[in-house]
């Protein structure tokens, strides 16, 4: 399940990408196979990094190694003190991570530090009003160790990145079909995954993720701009010279 659009990230062969807070590696794996790049996955949790590695072991690159080789590296590390030199990465993904970090401003400063001039980043956090409903229905949803510590307003987070010097390129919403699932989970008990309705909805989402048939693609296309679970934003770290225009014309999402 990808949240960041790798085409909007404009990932190219030969580039180096960091998936910051990679979790089980969904974006690390996707970037690795999307282009002949070096995909680096980093997470605070060692077990998560082990699962990411297992994903590569289970799905090796079987294409002939001609031209620019693919490469991946995995690491355990803290978003507030990243183990990389300044200007290390052409592209960076930080998906559904910042809402977990009390000092998220420190993480933003590290993102600025390690992104190359001319680099592009893709950031996603929970969309404000669907997240507010989850918090309203359930204390357990966010009041757990390692859980969500804040609800972002997209305009404020954009301003935080722009204050560092990043240039905003655009945004979109994603995973609209997932919002009602989490509202349901929160309403009946976020840890009650045996409920018949929860199990049925989870199965539907698994079909969307694994097979994505046409009816679910159409439903997702309608739901994403209305109630996307995640808001995704793209920024460039400027270098000398004028910046290109927005990725998709005027920004029309709330």
Name each region found by the language model:
Residues 175-254:
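A C-terminal cap/extension of S-adenosyl-L-methionine-dependent methyltransferases
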Residues 79, 147, 152, 230:
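A conserved catalytic-core signature of glycosyltransferases
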Residues 2-8, 154-157, 211-220:
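An amphipathic, basic-hydrophobic alpha-helix
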Residues 166-176:
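Conserved S-adenosyl-L-methionine
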Residues 57-60, 139-142, 186-190:
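Short, hinge-like loop/turn segments at secondary-structure boundaries
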Residues 126-150, 158-159:
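Short, glycine-/aromatic-enriched active-site segment of Class I SAM-dependent methyltransferases
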Residues 3-134, 156, 233-235:
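Conserved SAM-binding loop
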Residues 160-166:
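A structural motif corresponding to the C-terminal end of an alpha-helix
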